[in-house]
Amino acid sequence: MARTEPPASKPRVTRGTVYGAPGAPPTPRKAKPRWGRIALVIGGLAAVIVLVVAGCGYAYVTNLDEKLHRTDAFSGLDDRPGKSVSGTQNILFLGSDSRDGADYDPKGSPKTGAAGKNERSDAIMVLHIPADHKKAYIISIPRDTYVSVPELDGHGGARAKINAAFSWGGIPLTVKTVENFTGVKIDHVVKIDFNGFKDMTNALGGVDVTVNKTVTDPRSKRTFKAGVNHLDGDAALDYVRQRYGLPNGDFDRVQRQQIFLRALMQKATDSGTLSNPVKLKSFLDAATKSLTVDNDFSLKDMALEFRSLRPGDISFITSPHKGSQNIDGQSVVVSDKEKAIALWGAVEKDTVADWLAANPANNATKGR
């Protein structure tokens, strides 16, 4: 049976800018129904991920839907868009990690329940799917991005790193913070614990990633050699977690997460997986056990609507920033206001393809 988390109170959500200023609500989207035979199913993760997996039957996708954990991701958030998978979609992916302790709320202790004590979001991504459903864009927001965290249910109400919102107020406050930062309305939420990477990777028999230069993680003591590395579940978890010992720290970790998600998608959709029912079922079962989604999220509906997507149709982007600075005694990532407004404005206007064509360096596919 699906797990449901408790609701929170209900203050109003307003649209913001990349620096958190309030504004008018985003324009409602026009729905264009497009129904047909199921050919794809979305599994997922994150640190977060959308996987488009071909060859699953309608009944099996329905069974996967029933296995997903559910939460009231929009508790306390008013003026939500209508729930339809036709038209554009903006899906927030959160990769949570409980190993290192929580950030502390300026208004009190770390919130338990929706987020959970000692749980935080180490990967924050927005999946944007245009209205024609021919492409998809996964936009990473560095977890240390310095933003205005709005108040919700007595938590937040301060400037902080964006991932503090999850520790302070769980998924609802994270949704509100991301919407405030981007000016983009979130349609659905998918959260995965980083430990879910292990089971999904092992179910596929491991994945291959390319590393540019040999590097050792000082925490896990694992060495990733220059060239192609075959990662099992434990190695994959270390790969997406590492930031110490990397030339650009957390920025390289963001790119590693993007590289790993692409490798996982490619492995999950190759012929060796699709032609092996046992492997495919093992992977999808591992994914659904690790996922928490909003109450209206439907794998079945998304499998119908996004049936033409393949891993090669997905581009990875990082929200523009000016690098790290020291503010109030802590190292934070400073958003590039002008460039970020342009990117997130393109998401809102459904013109990301044009933005990416004008900014090709932001298509993140390099090895780390």
Language-model regions: role of each:
Residues 2-368:
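Non-catalytic, solvent-exposed segments at the cell envelope interface
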